[in-house]
Amino acid sequence: MEEKKTIIWAGFDVGKETFSASLDKITESGKAKITSLPCRDFKRNPEGVTKFFQWADGFVSEKELHIVMETTGCYSQQLTDWLNLSHPEVKVSIENARNIHAFIDSLNLPHKTDKLDAQAIARFGTERQPHPTKRPSKTILTIRELSRERTALIKARVELQNRRDTITSSVVRKINAQTIATLTIQIKKIEKEIKACIVENEEILAEVHIMTTMPGVSFVSAYNILAEIGSLKQYSAKELSAISGLAPRIRQSGSSVHSSFMSRRSSGRLRQILYLDSVAGVPKIPVLQDFQQRLLAKGKKKMMVRCACMRKMLLMLRSMVIHNRAFDENFLKFSQTSFDL
């Protein structure tokens, strides 16, 4: 029988310029004290990644290395790219910052430093054994960055437009108009880049095309959904409900049973998109209309019903993409078993 390799967990505390790395493993004598774990700082660049692996080689030897870090937006994503490029065989887990912070709080550490955080994150990996993170494709990451920049520019333009009627100075009014015009040009340029990215990728193009056949889901909504969570094909129905933050969270303690609420453990942008799509789409989709009326008849609150429809709508999109078929308002009536809702 093949002997199972010992896994060494590397905990990364990632910053803008540097990252702190610590190594941990379970030995025959048990777990070492957290503050005694080896730790070192490296530059957050390709050279720093190379130096990390050179340093870690002295501890890893024949053992398997698994890296875990908390999500820090572009910093953790860029560092993961360098890690994969340097050592593609090494597994990397990017964990929800809330989970890691809760774990660190439970350790009751005396101080808060980058070194201690890296050591605690390494212990998090040893104890929790997180699964490797599914890395989005380069195209999805590019679309995500472009779509978020587009949203930021639109928000800035709306603020300027709302202020336009209150401006009394002719000079300021002229600057306001010029800035709005510049933002409009930049927004159109970003939209053109997004379309080019989608057209170049046949798989993403096909998925967007199928999603836009559902009432309420526009081209912008479709690519924003993909930008936030990637292809819908990669998730089960339960995983998709959880990653969207729309799964209900139950609160019960002893004889006290509190009302459930939305978990919200994911992208707020995704829920915003689904909310707007459901407002436009539910009245045009008989299945969701019936579902909405049944919940309202049971006395459910309107916002709770809206969230349930958002979740149902997302799962319908997933089923359409998996089965590669356009929206059909009657498809649930003759294909109940094919769609995992």
Which residues make up each language-model segment?
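Phosphate-backbone recognition surface of nucleic-acid-processing proteins
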Residues: 219, 225-298, 302, 338-341
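Low-complexity, acidic/Ser/Thr- and charged residue-rich accessory regions of DNA metabolism proteins
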Residues: 255, 292-311, 316-341
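Gly/Thr-rich phosphate-binding beta-strand-loop-beta motif of the actin/hexokinase/Hsp70
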Residues: 2-28, 121, 153, 224
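Acidic, metal-coordinating catalytic cores used for nucleic-acid/nucleotide bond scission
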Residues: 68-79
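Short glycine-rich, Thr/Ser-proximal phosphate-binding strand/loop in the N-terminal lobe
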Residues: 15-47
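Long, charge-rich intrinsically disordered scaffolds of nucleic-acid metabolism proteins
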Residues: 85, 93-210, 214
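Short, basic/hydrophobic alpha-helical segments
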Residues: 46-66
